[in-house]
Amino acid sequence: MTFTASSSSCAITESPVVVALDYHERDKALAFVDKIDPRDCRLKVGKEMFTLFGPQLVRDLQQRGFDVFLDLKFHDIPNTTARAVAAAADLGVWMVNVHASGGARMMAAARDALAPFGKDAPLLIAVTVLTSMETSDLRDLGVTLSPAEHAERLVRLTQQCGLDGVVCSAQEAVRFKQVFGAAFKLVTPGIRPAGSEAGDQRRIMTPEQALSAGVDYMVIGRPVTQSVDPAQTLKDINASLKREA
């Protein structure tokens, strides 16, 4: 199926589902995408696929009608990060992210770089603590806080810098919504329908649990991309979310 591309300022789906594309071959990725409907989800392109296939892959997805979350987690000096974020906006992506650990000046520079794009600017979110990390991993880095405590500190900094939201674990979402407000977007990986394997994500929830926790956008990968009927899987997930709402 082929759909007309939409601009980043005019989303064609209200679904909170973002499907993570993790393919080694471009043709297989596009074959999967052609099985699903852009009204049922958005798509996430990460570092591996973007490194392999570049901006043209994003354009291919947009031409099929999908909003794209460019998940490159920029983390560099402020000027370099700002230029990278502006380049992502030029590409027309729906969402782009940076590492909150890059600091306030870096995040503010990224925010300012999007000002010229006005209503067409992508959502700018920050990564706090990767969902694969546990307390022991943070301790190895010299951080004595728990993942939730460290993440909350970074979330506070992110909001102070004027970004649109953060990537966080579903377990952290309840408190973050209470503390940082409904308008501050929460994007959560590690979301898997009941019965799915945990994979390399440590802090996981089902889509229904994530919605109840206050998650705005939930990233789902293999349970959809490896489904024998991904279109139906997406429809089932969205139907369950509507019942939960």
UniProtKB/Swiss-Prot annotation:
GO terms for cellular component: cytosol. GO terms for biological process: 'de novo' pyrimidine nucleobase biosynthetic process; 'de novo' UMP biosynthetic process. SUPFAM superfamilies: Ribulose-phoshate binding barrel (SSF51366). It catalyses: orotidine 5'-phosphate + H(+) = UMP + CO2. Transmembrane segments: none annotated. Its EC number is 4.1.1.23. Pathway: Pyrimidine metabolism; UMP biosynthesis via de novo pathway; UMP from orotate: step 2/2. The active site is at K73 (proton donor). Catalyzes the decarboxylation of orotidine 5'-monophosphate (OMP) to uridine 5'-monophosphate (UMP). PANTHER family: OROTIDINE 5'-PHOSPHATE DECARBOXYLASE. This is Orotidine 5'-phosphate decarboxylase.
